Amino acid sequence: MKQRTYIAIDLKSFYASVECRERGLDPLDTNLVVADESRTDKTICLAVTPSLKSYGISGRGRLFEVKQRVKEANVGRQHDAPGHRLDGTSHFFSELQANPSLAIDFIIAPPRMAYYMEYSTRIYQVYLKYIAPEDIVVYSIDEVFMDVTDYLNTYKLSAHDLAMKIILDVLETTGITATAGIGTNLFLCKVAMDIVAKHIPADKNGVRIAELDEMKFRRELWTHQPLTDFWRVGRGIAKKLEQNGMFTMGDVALCSERNEDLLYKLFGKNAELLIDHAWGWEPTTIEAIKAYRPSSNSLSSGQVLHCPYEPQKAKLVVREMTDLLVLDLVDKGLVTDQMVLTVGYDIENLTDPARRARYHGAVEKDPYGREIPKQAHGSINLDGHTSSTRKIMCAVSKLFDRIVDKNLLVRRMYVVANHVLPEADAPKKNDGAVQLDLFTDYAAEEEKQKVEDAALERERKIQAATLAIKKKYGKNAILKAMNLEEGATAKDRNAQIGGHKA
């Protein structure tokens, strides 16, 4: 089998770089963070420029952490400054390096998600100048995988030179630089980009390109720590491995030779993927990814509230989410026969003494290790496949009332339309044989069905008109009364993409 060559490209601090370029600033020399300061200092930072990261600031920290770290860095600068005094501020890294009397400053840029998507589209068009779309997988808004095996001979270039050529074209077109990883499979090119490239010096344009094959991976990364640096190894997997004496990928590879059953006992069928990656193997190709069709599909909507909600207000938000989810189904020509609801409770239910005293249910830990009441989760089957707002809203409201503890504050919710499929493929209710009996008035049943069909047809026309208005005039051009009630979030979320300002 022909050995393949893959390139992974990650745009450097993408959102922050876009904001710098739009201000006429150099992303490599400007202290800038993308965050919505209007949400308080606890808001998550979407991106941080490399110069600001150099002060020990995480790329995905909270805004208050950025401010705190800059304050600490300025204390150190003041201690080292002439006369122990800082005079003036700057958000330019080069100026701060040249003048120790300046205090570190930084720009807070509110996110503009729609604009970042436009930038990403422009960059994708650059990729298409070199690589066909069937050989590109878009991993995220700022990251892609490319199978360049059949292009190297065409361009008479090495993988390194081709990656550099593409990145420099992106830089010239948009002013945004990138990091690349090259590997003999998708896992290796990703790891080369995520781990190896971070430890090599950047060139004058801020570009880093690293390469890995299976043997080089084993030589250089079998001893690398922490395990969470590796693609698809999260904190939970790493913790289990460490509890069983495995702290590196080399340890995992050794265990797969000596005691493979232990890995399967710990991780089930996912152990196969972990073992492959420990040896630097990855059989999946871009061609296979493009050809993949899931056996079942779903459509979902999730939301984390800005503050704890009483259950009744939370139910309003769930209804709003369901309403928009159904419109999404209609827009895509899909139907569903099952709704799933997950509701997560707030930490205040256990930190407030009065609320804690009233709660005697199960407890679980949130991602930060804090105890919270166990989340509510349930599903409800619909009467056949449908995209009726009336039917689905009624079902989800019943499900909410059934599973949610009315004494607990709610913080997050997740609504899923399960088993979705194209409306044309949905089984019809009258398909198959029907058992007749002497006691049913079939004429009345038929008339009842006609009334129901007419109501559904009228509802479908309303849905179509609503979608047409929203597409032409904006998502908030038409709202329901519930969207104007206290605690409703749909109006604000309609002005967002991915939970951030559009």
Predicted regions mapped to residue ranges:
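Short, charged/polar surface micro-motifs in flexible loops or helix N-caps
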Residues: K12-F14, S38-K42, Y345-L350, V420-A424
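DNA-contacting surface of Y-family translesion DNA polymerases
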Residues: A8, A103, D229, K239-V410
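Acidic, metal-coordinating catalytic segment for phosphate/diphosphate chemistry
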Residues: V18, G369-A502
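Short clusters of hydrophobic/aromatic residues that line enzyme substrate/ligand-binding pockets
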Residues: I209-L212, L227, L299, I380, ...
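Gly/Gly-Pro- and Ser/Thr-rich, intrinsically disordered tail segments characteristic of DNA damage-repair
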Residues: M1-D276, E282-I286, E445-A502
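A glycine-rich phosphate-binding loop feature that marks nucleotide/adenosyl-phosphate handling sites
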Residues: T184-F187, D276-W279, V335-I347, L409-P422, ...
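Short, well-ordered secondary-structure micro-motifs
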Residues: V191-A192, T351-A354, D425-K428
